[in-house]
Each structure stands twice: as C-alpha cells, then as structure tokens.
C-alpha cells in the first residue's frame, strides 16, 4: 500500500453523497490502520475571528483577512473538535509535523496566536475530520469514488475555497467529466 499522506483526494463527479460531493480532502495520515484527512473546500459560514470570540480566546481579535479566515467543515468525525493545518512557525501543544512545510495542531494555543506576530504565515481552521478505517480508503479508491494528486501549498492556501475542486480536477490534466465511475471502464 502506498501512503497517500500529503495528497489531496478529489471527489469524483459521480459521488452524490451530500457531505462529500465535490470535496477536496487533504490527507494528513495514511497507514495500515486507516486514514485521516481535512476537507479544505467547505466554509461553514463563520469567520475565524468569530470563533476566537466564541471560545473566549481573544476579547477583540485582530481582523484575519487571509484565505484562512473562514472556518471550514473538516469532516463528519468529531465536528466539535478543531484542527489547524498551518505552515511551521512555532511548536504548539499537540502539533504534528506532516511535512517540512506543513503541520497539524489541535490545541487552543495556536488559535490564540492567530492575528499576532507568532501566528503561522498560512493556516486553515477546520472543525471535524474525515476518517477511514483499515482498507476503507483503498476500497473507495478501487470503486472510483476518489482520485488523488500530490498536495500543493497553492491549492491548500492560495486558491479560493469555491475554486478548489475545479482547480484540483484541472491539475489532473484531463477532463474528469469524461471518466467512468465504473471500475475497469475508461
């Protein structure tokens, strides 16, 4: 099994699941036990500033205007739990280095740093995550539910949320609408 860590999963057009339809998921972990990822293209309608106020992390949070300023739905698993995908800046509590250029943090201290001089340069705040049990993701890939591509910082941090699925499909180099959703058919 080849690990898909640091890859994007792109939902096939035939995936009509209301939660994952046209989703792009960054795979944080993928091993023999399963996989874990964060959906990167579904804002939930709340700004990071509002979240910081609700969590009482800042009384008057600075306006955070980067693309990471909206809170995203990361996935259906533990939607009350926050995850921050970010460029390395400092080491916060509960930080995991995913690559040399990307970390995942689940502690409140990284949220407190947002809008300050110690904030990561680029970040995504998400609630919940997408998870797969042992061999589940491999089965879904075999069923043509997902396509995968290597992750890029540009798609992760510099592309508007609503454009991420289209940009990801364009990076495949072919028209995704021409693919069959049936295994073994082109």
Swiss-Prot record:
Domain of life assignment: Bacteria
Family annotation (InterPro entries): AlgH-like (IPR003774)
Origin species: Shewanella sediminis (strain HAW-EB3)
Family to which this protein belongs: Belongs to the UPF0301 (AlgH) family.
Name this protein carries in UniProt: UPF0301 protein Ssed_1237
GO annotations of cellular component type: cytosol
């Amino acid at each position: 099994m080849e690990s898909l860590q640091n890859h994007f999963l792109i939902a096939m057009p035939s995936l009509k699941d209301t939660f994952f339809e046209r989703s792009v998921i960054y795979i944080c972990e993928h091993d023999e036990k399963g996989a874990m990822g964060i959906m990167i293209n579904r804002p939930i309608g709340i700004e990071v500033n509002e979240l910081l106020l609700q969590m009482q992390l800042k009384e008057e949070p600075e306006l955070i205007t980067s693309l990471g300023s909206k809170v995203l739905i990361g996935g259906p698993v533990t939607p009350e739990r926050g995850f921050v995908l970010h460029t390395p800046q400092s080491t916060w509590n509960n930080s995991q280095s995913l690559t040399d250029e990307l970390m995942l943090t689940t502690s409140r201290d990284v949220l407190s740093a947002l809008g300050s001089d110690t904030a990561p340069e680029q970040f995504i705040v998400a609630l919940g995550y997408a998870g797969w049990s042992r061999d589940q993701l491999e089965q879904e890939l075999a069923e043509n539910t997902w396509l995968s591509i290597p992750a890029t910082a540009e798609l992760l941090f510099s592309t508007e949320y609503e454009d991420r699925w289209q940009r990801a499909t364009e990076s495949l180099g072919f028209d995704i609408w021409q693919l069959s959703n049936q295994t073994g058919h082109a």
